[in-house]
Swiss-Prot record:
Pfam families: DUF480. Belongs to the UPF0502 family. This is UPF0502 protein ASA_1460. It comes from Aeromonas salmonicida (strain A449).
Length: 217
């Protein structure tokens, strides 16, 4: 693939895709909402603390790459950002709902097993069983490849999968990182879902407050 995303670019694209699906009423995102989405504590690995300046620099580069567009009018005070990463009229990347859910989750949390992907993508799409996850992963490998199956870790029953939108996976660096998310329990995943719902409610509240301020003004 010619497309290569840096780590922060992958985070921004993943966050935009997630919010497009989960909170369409607040999408496209303002810069502040995008910062909050990128720094979200749930469904993120690693958790980051990026500033508006950090995100603006990343967004500017993604706009240059034609992967993000500001949909606000020229004279608008608040920019609104929308991704053009995939499933656009003139773009080459086309994913099904399930494939997009997997891609989004891999962009936001890094390598994961099919079982983890099934439980963690439930806010983005639905899988009846792990077999459907395997089929979607196989399609992503065949089409691109856009994902890769990693060597199974010692003592683990399932292999993890990683996206290839940031280039080839550095297996040594990945092994040294040993992210805790790879060992998350079902209870931790349920907590993550609840935290995501709280973040969604915060975004909805911010949107309501902004509308109220406009009416009062």
């Amino acid at each position: 693939m010619e497309l290569v995303l840096g780590p922060l670019e992958a985070r921004v694209i993943g966050a935009l895709i997630e919010k497009e699906i989960c909170t369409p009423d607040q999408y496209p995102l303002s810069l502040n909402a995008l910062v909050n989405a990128c720094n979200q504590k749930s469904n993120r690995e690693p958790v980051l603390e990026l500033s508006e300046l950090d995100i603006r620099a990343v967004v500017d580069e993604l706009i240059r790459k034609r992967l993000v567009v500001n949909t606000a009018g020229f004279n608008a005070r608040v920019p609104r950002y929308q991704h053009r990463f995939c499933n656009t009229e003139f773009g080459t990347l086309k994913f099904s709902e399930q494939e997009l859910g997997i891609v989004c989750e891999l962009l936001l949390r890094g390598p994961q097993t099919p079982g983890e992907l099934r439980s963690r993508t439930n806010r983005l799409c639905s899988f009846d069983d792990v077999t459907q996850v395997d089929a979607a992963l196989a399609a992503l490998i065949e089409q691109g490849p856009y994902v890769v199956k990693l060597p199974r870790e010692p003592g683990k029953r399932e292999s993890r999968y990683a996206h290839l939108f940031s280039g080839e996976v550095d297996l040594q660096a990945l092994a040294e990182a040993s992210p805790a998310s790879s060992y998350a329990s079902p209870a931790a995943d349920r907590l993550s879902v609840l935290e995501e719902e709280v973040e969604t409610l915060k975004l909805q509240l911010q949107a309501l407050e902004a509308r109220l301020a406009q009416l009062e003004g």
